[in-house]
Structures are given as structure tokens and as C-alpha cells.
């Protein structure tokens, strides 16, 4: 089994075998920070998001496990603005996900909170305007950065039984669900607590750190949150905190 590890000094590839010390196979993009790694299980293509200090953000992919890398066209915020009227600019690539049964669909999560999609296998990406223009975003303070200047989309989960159904996790804003391939979005944060805010029960302003879906039961999701670990059995309509007497909780 191969394991890909993104670090501030490059992409590390290791071979993991039972009862053996992991073996380093390769280092790619030596000296550059690799912020995002995604392996498309459908095509086995590797994708990476790279932060160059001089050239900024870059997206690269390989179809032969790193023998040959190609640079993809970056998603663009050209023509879009932040809520304060300033021009929106790509700051960081955070996450990627495939489109399930839609073989050419890819989703890309970024900072400052834009979700991009591709319908041609990553040749081009377009900003998902319904989420970018979501009413909850237009009120300053509802979407904000956590450990960063701006909100960012770090998790994207696709229903394997219905590729039009997806969730994104935004820090800070919360979990949002779309049932129509991104044409509309609903916040799904009931039951979460944002103890760092004056009103901890806010619908938008939550800080999920990671979101995972059970592929066999897509209504079951888990999230590691700034304020605890939560799960839902009804697709995010209500979240329940996990309480453990011992261990992580």
C-alpha cells in the first residue's frame, strides 16, 4: 500500500507493508508546501495543491503515480468580490472531491470560502455562485476565518448513491448541504455549539474541522468540531455530541 503525505517541504510517498518499516519511495515538489492531496478512486489520478512562496497556489496532477506531473488551470475569482467590496482572490487550495457517478465532475474547496466545480475532469473550474452568494455569507461575522484570514472549505462529501447530493464543511461557517448538485444550499448546524461566540447556538458561524460521511449510510455523518466531536443520523438535520468517559471526545 502506498501512502501520500503532504508536508511543508514536499509530497512524500511511502510504501506500507505489514510488520515492516515504512519505505520512502519518492519526494515530489521538494521544498514546496503541499496543502492538499486527493486520489480520485475512479481514475487513480493523483491531485495536489501546492503553495509557492513566489508563484502562489498551484494545482498539479499525475496519472502515473508521480513519474510525470502536469499543471492544471487554476480556479479564478476574477469578477467576484468579498462582502466588503474588495476583489476576491484565491488564497489557498484546501480540498478536492470527485463527483461520484458523474465521471467528469470534480469539486474544489478553497480559501476565501469559494467552492469550485469542473465538468471536464479538471480542465477548467467555475465558482459555485449559489454558495458564494448565500445569504448567510453577506452578513459580516457569519462566515469568518479560523486560524486564517478568511473562511475556507476543507471537507467535501458526496453521497455515493446520488451524486447530486453533497455536503461541504466551512471553517468558520459550518456544514452546508445541497440536494441539487450545488444549485441551492441549506445550513445543517442544529445541535452544534460554538462556545467562542456570544450565541453558541448560531445557525451559521460554527467551526467544523473535518467532515466524514458513512458511504453505506449517507445520512450518517461525523465531524470533528472546534467544540467537540458530533454525529448525525438524519443528514445533518440534528447533530449530537459524542461524550466519552475515556479517550477522545
Please describe what each predicted stretch is.
Residues 1-249:
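Extracellular glycan-interacting surfaces
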